[in-house]
């Protein structure tokens, strides 16, 4: 016997982890399966909250499970799914075609993400500091995303946590594939695409009546948490040019901060025309004040 393998076989096993893995395998195909996955992840690193979502390219994500921390519950249930998900780094990574794997927020977030309004609203304001996502790609247009989170009361995830999660990832991904094969028919019955079509229309048409196409590209990078330097790199131009575009955006939209821009973008989503080319900002601004207050 290879002495290296002998040593590995003699390593002590964590009985709690083994029990959690056994429960996860036994629960494949059941409604409680995602709970058992979170229990497994909670055995290898500290987890304050977490959940699972089904990502779609052509419709809004579907929440399967979310174990909230108390502060997260202070947000309306649909606060994320009503549109802001389009700015989520993991959702954007999914749209870009990333492979199945483990993704740490600090590795994939844009360089100014932690100063963005999105991070303030959906992380720090509700007490979160960090997250790790385990994404399994079903096909080009769909993926299952399992996520775990840390609160601001505790230290962010560390490299040792990621090593442990990545060690277990092949087992979890294999179990995910089996679970999906048994439950796919039920998942496909969810077909509400209206919100996602409105979100996509807002991304494509927001402020088109006031801004140039390049300014609108810069705007989306702004609210996604990209710095001027990284935006310039993505758009293959200079940082100085991007800064000029940013000034023009603030002037044309009569806003003074990223918080105002983020808020305006979100408020315009209900006024977007699905699959259309109408500027939702123009519709929003022309709507009666009472109608705007309801969004």
Name each model-derived stretch:
Residues 225-260:
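Recognition helix of helix-turn-helix DNA-binding domains
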Residues 214-218:
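The N-cap/first-turn positions of alpha helices
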Residues 222-226, 265:
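Short helix-to-turn junction characteristic of helix-turn-helix DNA-binding domains
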Residues 4-12, 16-32, 36-142, 147-153, ...:
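Regulatory input/activation interfaces that engage signals or partners
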Residues 201-208, 250-295:
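Basic, Lys/Arg-enriched C-terminal extension of HTH/homeodomain DNA-binding domains
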Residues 166, 220, 233, 251, ...:
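A cross-family signal for key residues in well-ordered alpha-helices
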Residues 176-193:
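Short alpha-helical interdomain "coupling" segment at the junction between an upstream regulatory sensor module
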């Amino acid at each position: 016997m290879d002495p290296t393998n002998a040593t590995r076989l003699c390593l002590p096993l964590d009985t709690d982890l083994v029990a959690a893995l056994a429960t996860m395998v036994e629960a494949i195909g059941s409604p409680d399966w995602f709970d058992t996955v979170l229990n497994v992840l909670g055995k290898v690193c500290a987890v304050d909250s977490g959940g699972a979502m089904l990502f779609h390219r052509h419709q809004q994500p579907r929440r399967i499970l979310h174990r909230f921390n108390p502060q997260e519950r202070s947000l309306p249930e649909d606060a994320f799914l009503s549109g802001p998900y389009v700015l989520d780094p993991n959702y954007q990574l999914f749209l870009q075609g990333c492979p199945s794997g483990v993704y740490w927020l600090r590795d994939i977030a844009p360089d100014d993400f932690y100063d963005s309004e999105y991070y303030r609203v959906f992380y720090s304001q509700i007490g979160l500091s960090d997250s790790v996502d385990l994404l399994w790609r079903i096909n080009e247009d769909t993926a299952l995303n399992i996520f775990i989170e840390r609160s601001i009361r505790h230290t962010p995830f560390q490299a040792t946590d990621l090593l442990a999660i990545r060690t277990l990832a092949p087992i979890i991904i294999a179990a995910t594939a089996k679970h999906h094969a048994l439950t796919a028919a039920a998942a496909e019955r969810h077909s509400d695409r209206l919100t996602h079509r409105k979100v996509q229309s807002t991304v494509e048409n927001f402020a088109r009546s006031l801004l140039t196409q390049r300014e609108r590209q810069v705007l989306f990078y702004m609210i996604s948490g990209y710095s001027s330097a990284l935006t310039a790199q993505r758009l293959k131009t200079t940082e100085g040019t991007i800064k000029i575009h940013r000034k023009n955006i603030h002037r044309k939209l009569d806003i003074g901060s990223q918080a105002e821009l983020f808020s305006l973008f979100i408020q315009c989503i209900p006024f977007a025309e699905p699959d259309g080319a109408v500027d939702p900002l123009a519709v929003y601004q022309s709507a009666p004040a009472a109608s705007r207050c309801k969004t």
